[in-house]
Amino acid sequence: MSGVLNAVYVIAGRPGGLRKCLQYEIMSTVSAPQTIPVDEFIDRLRGLSEGVITKQAIYDFLVSYEVRPQDLERYKLWLPDRHTRNKIFRNEMLECMLICWPIGAITPLHTHNGQLGWMTMLEGKLLVENFRKIDCNRPENQQVVGMDCLAGATRIEMQQLGTELCVPGGPLNTVDKKQTIHRIKNLPEWNERAVSLHVYSRPIDSCVVFDLDAQRCFRRSAECSVPSAEK
């Protein structure tokens, strides 16, 4: 299927503030991906991890193949008040997980530890808000090996860059190595749960979280909610 779908969502701002109208242009994929069993999906991912991993290579894989829906049921864990990260596959080079988003779920504003990332929507929809860090009072903490930042700032200046609507059949959301910072929301007014599939290279064990109200940032664990169900 090909074509363009224009969708307009009006999102209420803070009390007393202006209402913000966001227009999204959603490009559908040119052709439907091939549906394969989860074991084959994992085997193909494992094969990719043995070669040179590029942003385009994983992107091409995820638009070409999708996991058979019934195979994903055993990876789903739902909590009423927060999203869950459920591991499908992980080795030294790649990590694949299913994230379940209850109504109203929202992530904190966070980095990705300098790694590559890909997200494809399976059910529902998600709003991604992208940011850029302009300044902080601990710039020296970014000069470390093996992670994007030690965190610990008590003054942070951020700029919002844009907003993306992620839907099944739409373009993949990607994370690059240039310290992509974003937060993801399943808006309450949509009144539906959401499910997304994520791949990271390399696996992300921790990330920097930004609390703009308290003007601080800190590192926190990015471990999955439950162990892998793979055989």
Predicted regions and their residues:
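Short beta-strand His + acidic residue motifs that chelate non-heme Fe in jelly-roll/DSBH
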Residues: P108-H110, V128-E129, T174, I181-P188
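Short acidic-glycine-tyrosine-enriched beta hairpin
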Residues: I134-Q179
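N-terminal leader/capping segments at the start of a protein or of a new domain
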Residues: V8-Q70
